[in-house]
């Protein structure tokens, strides 16, 4: 992304997610950075954020390192994964094929093997479709299960955050951080279907 952070963002080196690095969809507030939501005109008008979106702060406080911001479909409005302004992210698991969207860059980034996990959003398939197209694990939790404050909406009554990983143990760790508001219960998968 032309406006990705110029250096890694890390709050702490300890925690459940320490030594894991990630990228995030161009959809949320990142302290001292602007967001484009896949549109350069929106980026030019957007003011730098005063703080991190709460979900992002939780991930950073758990020790993960933010490596960059990923391309998404313009204003999150597609399941294809193309962006006419910034280009279509390359799905290295299926070269020549679209990565699926709208969290296209978040999924495609993991096919490079440079990142441990990525964050996206899902309104009507924007995590599930790219996970399928790119051969990844992806999860869309129940609506309102994760605080979406600081996340630019597409359809607030349907929007939720989601994440991708190549390994199920990492997917589970992210769930333990994002889905446990009181830290008393551990997130777990009941069964795989």
Locations of regions flagged by a protein language model:
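Gly/Ser-rich catalytic/binding loops embedded in alpha/beta enzyme cores
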Residues: 1-116
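Fold-level recognition of mixed alpha/beta catalytic cores in primary-metabolism enzymes, strongest
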Residues: 110-111, 116-193
């Amino acid at each position: 992304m032309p406006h990705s952070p110029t250096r890694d963002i890390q709050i702490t080196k300890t925690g459940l997610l320490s030594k894991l690095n990630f990228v995030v969809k161009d959809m949320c507030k990142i302290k001292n950075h602007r967001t484009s939501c896949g549109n350069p005109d929106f980026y030019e008008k957007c003011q730098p954020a005063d703080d991190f979106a709460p979900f992002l702060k939780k991930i950073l406080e758990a020790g993960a390192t933010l490596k960059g911001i990923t391309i998404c479909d313009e204003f999150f409005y597609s399941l294809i994964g193309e962006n006419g302004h910034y280009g279509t992210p390359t799905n290295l698991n299926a070269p020549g094929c679209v990565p699926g969207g709208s969290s296209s860059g978040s999924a495609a980034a993991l096919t490079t093997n440079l990142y441990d996990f990525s964050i996206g959003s899902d309104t009507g398939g924007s995590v599930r479709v790219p996970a399928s197209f790119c051969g990844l694990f992806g999860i869309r939790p129940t609506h309102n299960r994760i605080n979406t404050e600081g996340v630019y909406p597409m359809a607030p009554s349907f929007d939720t955050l989601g994440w991708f990983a190549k390994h199920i143990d990492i997917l589970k760790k992210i769930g333990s951080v994002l889905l446990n508001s009181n830290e008393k219960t551990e997130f777990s998968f009941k069964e795989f279907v």
